[in-house]
Amino acid sequence: MKIYHIPAAPPLYTNTFLLVGENGLAAAVDPAAGAQEYLRLLEQEGARLTHILLTHGHYDHVGAVEELQRKTGAKVWLAPQDACGGELFPFTTPDNAYADGEEIRVDTDLAFRVIATPGHSAGSVCLLCGGLLFSGDTLFAGDVGRTDLPGGSWDTLRKSLKKLCAAVTENVQVLPGHEEFSTMDRERANNRYLQF
């Protein structure tokens, strides 16, 4: 498996990712804006985008979805709670809804386990892929996602963080939706929001 970090330009500053499996099947995680870089990397790898996996539906995580879907035929995964449309949630029609705990297999060496983590938004999920945790806006390095936006709830996020810590016991790399990367061990030790 190969992974490409594609940071979105200002003002979004979203961490987005393209993962390519050994047989050339690929997944995009939170393609924020500008489909061109994804398409260039897919061509460079001789890969085919089959999955677009969204950690939640906020505008700064979905900007390239429509163009990527149109140009590649990839299917979109998103929790139905976040497919509602509006200012913060552009209308994104998912082809598939997440089920908590399900495995989404993209290629023989590329699979994601879904961990439902509502709180930042009603439909937020984290995606565990081997030693990588795509945490969206649920967990950041030293911080957590805000809960003052529509669909957000601090009480729900706290429960989700406890669940996440219980579900991810190994020291995986945390790849959040914004800012720097971290590890679960570092977050357990230093993130005040994970001190239960």
Question: What are these model-derived regions, one by one?
Answer:
Residues 2, 108-113:
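Short beta-strand or tight-loop elements
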Residues 6, 98, 117:
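Hydrophobic residues at beta-strand termini and immediately following loops
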Residues 12, 33-110, 192-193:
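Active-site HxH/HxHxD metal-binding segment of metal-dependent hydrolases
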